Amino acid sequence: MFEATTILGYRGEFNNKKFALIGGDGQVTLGNCVVKANATKIRSLYHNQVLSGFAGSTADAFSLFDMFERILESKKGDLFKSVVDFSKEWRKDKYLRRLEAMMIVLNLDHIFILSGTGDVLEAEDNKIAAIGSGGNYALSAARALDCFAHLEPKKLVEESLKIAGDLCIYTNTNIKILEL
């Protein structure tokens, strides 16, 4: 279902300054064929205060982006309240419950995974989250690099996604990164 991408979100503090980044690869896969190598699956929302990225069906993801952005606007950028209301609305709608997409949303203070069933999952460490077919590779690499490498945040995201791209056939190394 989500065999098409890798998205990695990373937030925290580096050199006494808060940061939030999201990165994703550019590969779009249809069955066993690569149909696009430079797609953009990450976005900045609410006056560049929230970052998001998706894995799964593109049409479904854009529906979710639009819905989430509307709720985020109504909550004046409050990410926590937005994900809670988003989940409530998602679970009420029979059409939305069948969407085949996942999202990561984050700001300087929080990072969440929004699942295809309407669940909201806060990253275990409130620091690193990954989705998509290469998500576990990127998550493992990011956790190891975060603990031991002391890289700048953007470099950590880039290197973690490169590792995922080397291991996952549905992920490439055409990486795009957004940061707050």
From Swiss-Prot:
<keyword id="KW-0963">Cytoplasm</keyword>
<dbReference type="InterPro" id="IPR001353">
    <property type="entry name" value="Proteasome_sua/b"/>
</dbReference>
<comment type="function">
    <text>Protease subunit of a proteasome-like degradation complex believed to be a general protein degrading machinery.</text>
</comment>
<keyword id="KW-0888">Threonine protease</keyword>
<dbReference type="GO" id="GO:0051603">
    <property type="term" value="P:proteolysis involved in protein catabolic process"/>
</dbReference>
<dbReference type="InterPro" id="IPR022281">
    <property type="entry name" value="ATP-dep_Prtase_HsIV_su"/>
</dbReference>
<protein>
    <recommendedName>
        <fullName>ATP-dependent protease subunit HslV</fullName>
        <ecNumber>3.4.25.2</ecNumber>
    </recommendedName>
</protein>
<dbReference type="InterPro" id="IPR023333">
    <property type="entry name" value="Proteasome_suB-type"/>
</dbReference>
<dbReference type="InterPro" id="IPR029055">
    <property type="entry name" value="Ntn_hydrolases_N"/>
</dbReference>
<dbReference type="GO" id="GO:0009376">
    <property type="term" value="C:HslUV protease complex"/>
</dbReference>
<comment type="similarity">
    <text>Belongs to the peptidase T1B family. HslV subfamily.</text>
</comment>
<keyword id="KW-0915">Sodium</keyword>
<keyword id="KW-0346">Stress response</keyword>
<dbReference type="GO" id="GO:0004298">
    <property type="term" value="F:threonine-type endopeptidase activity"/>
</dbReference>
<keyword id="KW-0479">Metal-binding</keyword>
<feature type="active site">
    <location>
        <position position="5"/>
    </location>
</feature>
<dbReference type="Pfam" id="PF00227">
    <property type="entry name" value="Proteasome"/>
</dbReference>
<keyword id="KW-0645">Protease</keyword>
<keyword id="KW-0378">Hydrolase</keyword>
<feature type="binding site">
    <location>
        <position position="171"/>
    </location>
    <ligand>
        <name>Na(+)</name>
    </ligand>
</feature>
<dbReference type="GO" id="GO:0005839">
    <property type="term" value="C:proteasome core complex"/>
</dbReference>
<keyword id="KW-0021">Allosteric enzyme</keyword>
<comment type="subunit">
    <text>A double ring-shaped homohexamer of HslV is capped on each side by a ring-shaped HslU homohexamer. The assembly of the HslU/HslV complex is dependent on binding of ATP.</text>
</comment>
<feature type="binding site">
    <location>
        <position position="168"/>
    </location>
    <ligand>
        <name>Na(+)</name>
    </ligand>
</feature>
<dbReference type="GO" id="GO:0046872">
    <property type="term" value="F:metal ion binding"/>
</dbReference>
<feature type="binding site">
    <location>
        <position position="165"/>
    </location>
    <ligand>
        <name>Na(+)</name>
    </ligand>
</feature>
